[in-house]
Amino acid sequence: MLEARDVVCIRDEHVLFSALSFTASSGEMVQIAGANGVGKTSLLRMLSGLATPESGDVCWQGQRINRIREHFNQQLLWLGHQPGIKSVLTGEENLRFFYPQQHQDAHWQALAAVGLAGYEDVPVARLSAGQQRRVALARLWLTDVPLWILDEPLTALDVAGVEMLTQRMEHHIAHGGIIILTTHQPLRPFAQSIRCIQLTPSEGTP
C-alpha cells in the first residue's frame, strides 16, 4: 500500500495543495485529476520519491519512503511525461539499458507487444512521437514491480496504442498491482473501478 499523509506542496511561494491524504492499495488504480498547474505532476514526483513534500509523509507498506529508499525503488516503476529514453539508442538498446539482466528476446517481445515489431534496431530519434512513447511503455511488459506511477502515459498514442496500454494496465491491476496516474484522456474501461483524487487550485500562501 502507498500512502500520502498530510502532504503539502509549495511552489514559488504558492501552496498548490495541503493536508492531502489518501491510500492506494493492491489491485487499485488511482487517477490524480485537476486543471493544469494544480500540482498533479508535483504530487506524482513526491509519491515516487523524486521530490520532497514541504511537510507530510509518503509511506510504502507503512514505512516512510525516505527511510527505505533502496527497497522502495525496487518496488516502483516511474514513467514521466517525457519518454525518458535515449534518442541515439535503438528501442532494444534502451530496454537493455533498463533491463540488462533480461535476454534480448524479452526486449524484442516487449517491443512487439507495443506494436514495434520490426523497429527493434531503429534509432529512437528516427521514430515518431507515438513510437517513442511506445518504446518507453514497453518497460511495462518487462517489469514485475507492484507499483506503477505514470504521468500522462496516453500522450501521443493513437487509438490502437491506447487500447494496448489499457489492456496492460487491466492485467496489472487484476494481478494485484497498484497504478497511480494522471491523464487528460477518458479511461472508460476503468470507469467503475478507478478512484479519482481531484486537485483544485489553492489560493493560499505559506
From Swiss-Prot:
Compartment(s) where it occurs, according to its Swiss-Prot or TrEMBL record: Cell inner membrane
Keyword Chaperone tagged: no
An individual GO BP term: cytochrome complex assembly
Stored PROSITE patterns: ABC_TRANSPORTER_1, ABC_TRANSPORTER_2, CCMA
Coiled coil: none
Keywords associated with the record: ATP-binding, Cell inner membrane, Cell membrane, Cytochrome c-type biogenesis, Membrane, Nucleotide-binding, Translocase, Transport
Cleavable signal peptide: none
Membrane topology note: Peripheral membrane protein
The keyword Iron is assigned to this record: no
Predominant cellular place of this UniProt entry's protein: membrane
Class of this enzyme: translocase
Catalytic activity: heme b(in) + ATP + H2O = heme b(out) + ADP + phosphate + H(+)
Pfam families recorded: ABC_tran
GO MF annotation terms: ABC-type heme transporter activity; ATP binding; ATP hydrolysis activity
EC number: 7.6.2.5
Residues noted as binding ATP in the record, renumbered to the chain: G34, A35, N36, G37, V38, G39, K40, T41
CC per GO annotation: plasma membrane
Primary role: Part of the ABC transporter complex CcmAB involved in the biogenesis of c-type cytochromes; once thought to export heme, this seems not to be the case, but its exact role is uncertain. Responsible for energy coupling to the transport system.
Family that this chain belongs to: Belongs to the ABC transporter superfamily. CcmA exporter (TC 3.A.1.107) family.
Subunit structure: The complex is composed of two ATP-binding proteins (CcmA) and two transmembrane proteins (CcmB).
Database matches in PANTHER family: ABC TRANSPORTER I FAMILY MEMBER 1
Protein name as annotated: Cytochrome c biogenesis ATP-binding export protein CcmA
